Amino acid sequence: GYGADWRAAVSTTVATLPLGYADGIPRAVQGRGQVHLAGAMRPVAGRVSMDMLTVDVNEIADAAVGDEVVLIGAQGDGMIPCEELATRSHTITYEILSRLGSRVPRVFFEAGHITGHRNFGGGAA
């Protein structure tokens, strides 16, 4: 990423996610943020860029393009509440929610089932 701030201590596999601070992901999660991928918490690797962020997936042998990655919400038995992202970003929950950009699809769940979705900008919902 920008400035080569993050360097892997060992040979590492890194996943590139197609969202960044233009989508409302706080730049402050650099070095503090985590995502859920394949049932495991994985750290954000390096800086959050305008349109992408990178995640260390070294311990996930079968990580593949198209895998679901969760930044806010639940995956399997794991959960990343918005409050946690806000705390790691040194801000409040409402700032996180109000900054989510139009390119981020909204998916609505009730009792574990998708009840609707809304896409305000580019990308598929």
Where are these regions (language model features)?
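Active-site anion/phosphate-binding pocket segments in diverse small-molecule metabolic enzymes
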Residues: G1-A125
